[in-house]
Amino acid sequence: MTPTGLGYIPMVVEQSGRGERAYDIYSRLLRERLIFLVGPVNDATANLVVAQLLFLESENPDKDISFYINSPGGSVYAGMAIFDTMQFVKPDVSTLCTGLAASMGAFLLAAGKKGKRFSLPNSRIMIHQPSGGAQGQASDIQIQAKEILDLRERLNRILAENTGQSMERIAIDTERDTFMSAEDALSYGLVDKVLARREDV
């Protein structure tokens, strides 16, 4: 279950009484219930994350899943597939920003279980409204415009619920790109704690 588009992926060799077994690093970490969203949110990455969430739920429905995010965002539809699955599965999904959680990446970061949403100290978080392009006849453009406005309303409502901010504040802050430090994201309610070391968890 390797994230796509990462080039060379290191292998880990484990030895046991039954011999050796090689895993790519992400498959090995999946055994520890760690999932990664690295790079853009698209159908391919969303399908991988959804499959891994469902797999880990089937393995143990009572043990937390850790979801590491380093993503500039991407497709709203693909991101909503991940979001809905995070809410659907029984285990708590803990989120951690490593590097950048922008756009849909920030939305998914905030969607983790309350009290279990983290950021590393030098990570950056960015929220904004969904964007899209439309072409074709005027009626087609009108349909697309309505869809993007509906998506913006839905995303803002969920973000308000997850952060404790008002809908009005979310609407203002997502009007343009709003970048935040890890501490800013903590104050805003996107994360619950900034972690400098593992023992801080």
Swiss-Prot record:
One GO location term (cellular component): cytoplasm
PROSITE patterns: CLP_PROTEASE_HIS
UniProt xrefs under SUPFAM superfamilies: ClpP/crotonase
Family: Belongs to the peptidase S14 family.
Active site: S103, H128
Gene3D superfamilies linked to this entry: 2-enoyl-CoA Hydratase, Chain A, domain 1 (3.90.226.10)
Protein name: ATP-dependent Clp protease proteolytic subunit
Assembly, per entry: Fourteen ClpP subunits assemble into 2 heptameric rings which stack back to back to give a disk-like structure with a central cavity, resembling the structure of eukaryotic proteasomes.
Encoding gene, per UniProt annotation: clpP
The reaction(s) this protein catalyses: Hydrolysis of proteins to small peptides in the presence of ATP and magnesium. alpha-casein is the usual test substrate. In the absence of ATP, only oligopeptides shorter than five residues are hydrolyzed (such as succinyl-Leu-Tyr-|-NHMec, and Leu-Tyr-Leu-|-Tyr-Trp, in which cleavage of the -Tyr-|-Leu- and -Tyr-|-Trp bonds also occurs)
